[in-house]
Amino acid sequence: MKKKIQFLFNKPQLSENIGMSIRSLGCFGFDEVGLVSPKKSWPNDKGIRASKHFELIAKKVKIFNSIPEAIAKSNIVVATSVRRRELSIPLINFEEFYKLKAKKITIIFGQENNGLSNKEISYANYILTIPTQKNKSLNLSHTAAIVAYMLSRSTKVLQETIVKNNLKSQDIEKFINYLMLLLENRQFTTIEAKTHNLELSLRSFLKTSNIDQK
């Protein structure tokens, strides 16, 4: 499954962190990397140098303008977070991750200073956390290295059998956009905050229901 996992970095601030993350992923055999709106244009010299022996991976990184665009073809999306969120998205540990079967899985990492917002996490089917002590201060590349190592150490990750064909993220987003437009036309609510919360709740429900393409 290694080639079926996309490591997606959302709004990364430092090119060196991107390069070191790519180096970490490459060491464990992962080579599909995406960036959403990086602060500095990519590729660049600092990032390439930081990637060390994995320059080829660094140069074929895909750049996206938004998370929905980046995960459009993914059947399962996993968001990383250092803290619990007030969202109805289930937590998943590595043992449970090993059992996931899908054509395409994306793991999203937040930016260095703020992580992922609730809206950004709402695009995920699951939330993955790394247990730490009180000071939760893992560098982006450290987090990527831990996740890549944990996934590479299990032979189950290498299985190719597909047992369920979940809806792609782009299909879910199309449905949400259609429904929100329908509610807007019927003036279901004119309060922006309520509309925003409704969209998050709806996305969380659809993402965690494991709806397949049947």
Identify the role of each PLM range:
Residues 1-214:
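Post-transcriptional modification and biogenesis factors for structured RNAs
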